[in-house]
Amino acid sequence: MGIRFRVTGAALALTALLAQAASAQDSPQDGKLILPTIDVSSSRLGAGIVGTSTSVITAEDIRRAPAQTLPDILSREPGIQVTNLFGGVNGARSAVDMRGFGAAAGSNTLILIDGRRITDLDLTGVDLASIPRESIERIEITRGNSGVVLYGDGAVGGVINIVTKSAAGSPPSARVETGFGSFKQREGAASAGGSNGPWSASLYGNGVNSDGYRVNNFYRQANGTGDFRYTVPDGSFYLKLSGDGQYIGLPGARRVDPVAGLDQLTTDRTGATTPYDHSQKDGANATAGITRLLAPGAELIVDGGIRYKREQAQFYNATATVATSDPNKAVDTMLTTTSFTPRVKLDSLFGTLPWNAIGGIDYYRAVYGSDRPLYLGAPPIDRYDLTQSSLGLYWQQTLSVLPSTDISAGGRIQRVTVSARDKFDINAPGGQQCFIDFGCFPANVEGLPFDTTETHRAFHLGLDQRFNENIAVFGRWAESFRVPNVDERVGVVTVGNGVPTTFDLRTQRSHDWEAGTRLHFGRLDIQSSIYDMMLTDEIHFRYGPNFEANNINLDPTRRYGNETIASYRVSDELRFKAGAAYTRSVFRQGLFAGNDVPLVSRWTGNAGVSWNIWQKWLVFDGVVRLVGSRRMDNDQTNVQPKIPASTTVDVRLGGEIEKIFWSFAIQNLLNVSYFDYAIASPYPYGPGSQLNTYNAYPLQGRSYMLKVGMTY
């Protein structure tokens, strides 16, 4: 865990140094704070992907949000649903789902930082808790398949691009903040930045400690990022560094079993099934690049990066005690991803018609090594090694055929090479299973070597038509794909059933279309769209009868729905914002044809208000969020109980007095008892039926957070 504390300590130290020379930033005139505008009235050449449904969350939106985590902030956007397994502490390990992919959400929503993909090829996904909130300039959300051309595989439900701040051209500044909240949560954050001529630097660090809502729900997190730049009129050089560390308790589920008379959601909601399980994750990232203006309207960007992540987890049997450990299994995984992504941006005229384009090459190489011992430090029972390389070539062009009409077209071709191996050691602790009177048997079978090379293609076609300053329409058609991740490949067979893993899954493919409108009438802005997505070979985890537990390619599936977002500005001091989404995720062929895909709510919505009560000295923000009922994980038959619908209210009061700022937030104001993830028993039929039996992961009730800080 050393890296995370060293990174945060360095950030705090630099903050103190820069603060001595920092100058106070200008305050709004007469202390008046004006709410930022929301622009959904037009699509401009070079702003986003033409024809797509997009939205932007600004730094001010993040700072004023009553929600305390990035996943919760994202869940306010129509079409985005969030699943939490660990009590929702700081959003750790939360899955962000765009357009209804349920348990596979993390592999179908592509996460970027500054336009570079950070979604790894394992199932842990992107942990948004590792990103300091204060480092974020804005979050750009692009829905649907169209992001695959620019950013590559995995952009099926959509793309979330987190754009970070730069200190280029800025005076010296610094910010420190501390917070205290429910469940003994303590937070600290610091940032500093500034520039001197062409040189600039900025640092952000934060740390969070919490005991969590449940037993064995403790959480320790520290993050640090740095941005260093040299900028001149015709180019720049930049270096970005980050490090994060996390240590978290894994309390397990609360079981409901009517036959056994068990309802832990009611009798022991905050208890732990696994009071000693825990996980530790450490990561480090570096990106360096140059930009060069080749000619007016022609810019070259050449950058590359390396990401390293190590995760260790220890799991114990139910008989474990403090005095006598009884290990069940452990995981020790290292993943290193290197990338090289040169590209060119062009902006010119075709006759009298403005056009722009972006094209380039993406090269990524990921090396994965995972030991699966009985306990950490022991020789591994299985050692999985996988190397995946991808080389993509893409081009996307936008043309303004009329002052009111933009069209866009793009394509990508990507070659993916995968090599996977499994080494099984029968002599390792836990490598054999022994039974009285029957002898000992291997706990697993060594997997078969796997090597494959595939070529995949994707495209995007888009149109934006602005009829006048009040009404615009947009539409698009796209094809996307998703390559199986390493954990899905490892799990194509049930561990311990005597069948070797083959690592072989088919690549998931998707086609979708979307059409929508943007309306702007005075103080009212509305964006609404409908979409339809057809998928083949969708990758899904199945836990079925006869102790089957493996990843498979599903029969064809479909997503369709509507997403609407609206904002009404009453005045510079008062604004209302609301959103609603209807999301259908269904099997369209096979045994479950017509059934809902689990973990997807059909209806979601939210309404919020931002009110500057007394200029900038006292401001109020409130959000009401509705999440409809959804099928539990593993309930493809659609016969088990649903995860109940929930309505939660979050509120925040805050303000600024010269250099001092403060806030007091309450999450789940009405103290609603709810959960957003549960897994149903695979035995709903026949003798010994476990209908209405499931494991749920409850989320915290009413909680508080008080923060105070200072800017320099």
Task: State where each predicted segment sits.
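Extracytoplasmic beta-strand/coil segments of soluble accessory domains associated
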Residues: 43, 71, 75-120
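Short acidic/polar hinge/loop motifs at secondary-structure boundaries
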Residues: 116-144, 162-163
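Transmembrane beta-barrel wall of Gram-negative outer-membrane proteins
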Residues: 180-209, 214-253, 276-295, 346, ...
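Face-selective signature of the C-terminal outer-membrane beta-barrel domain
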Residues: 233-242, 279-436, 448-449, 464-466, ...
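Membrane-embedded beta-barrel scaffold of Gram-negative outer-membrane proteins
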Residues: 299-317, 466, 472-478, 482-484, ...
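Gram-negative outer-membrane beta-barrel transporters
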Residues: 402-407, 415, 525, 530-535, ...
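C-terminal beta-signal and adjacent terminal beta-strands/loops
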Residues: 626-635, 654-712
